Amino acid sequence: MDSEKIAQTLVELRGARPRAEVATALGVSVSALAMYETGDRIPRDETKRKIAQYYEKTVEEIFYA
C-alpha cells in the first residue's frame, strides 16, 4: 500500500468538492481527511469502506490499485 499513491487518488476523487463536505459525509474530521489526502495517515478498514462507497468505487480500486 503506497501512501503517496493513495493520497493522490483521494485528492483526485474529491476534485472540487470542499474537504469539509466530504469529511462530514464520511463521518471523519476535516483534519483526518487532510491526513489521508497527504499520506500522513492510512484510514482504518471501516473508513476505507465508507470512502469507497462515497466515491462509488471499490476499496481495492482506491487503496490497492
Residue ranges of each PLM-predicted region?
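A short, Lys/Arg-rich alpha-helix, primarily the initiator
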Residues: M1-A16, E60, Y64
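Active-site phosphate/pyrophosphate- and oxyanion-stabilizing loops and adjacent acidic/basic residues
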Residues: V11, A20, R49
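Residue-level signal for the short linker/turn that defines the boundary of a DNA-recognition helix
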Residues: A16-P18, P43-E46
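Short alpha-helical DNA-recognition segment
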Residues: A16-T38
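Short coil turns linking two alpha-helices in DNA-binding domains
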Residues: S29-A32, R44, T58
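Phosphate-coordinating loops and pocket residues in cytosolic domains that bind phosphorylated ligands
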Residues: M35, Y64-A65
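DNA major-groove recognition helix of helix-turn-helix/homeodomain DNA-binding modules
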Residues: E46-E61
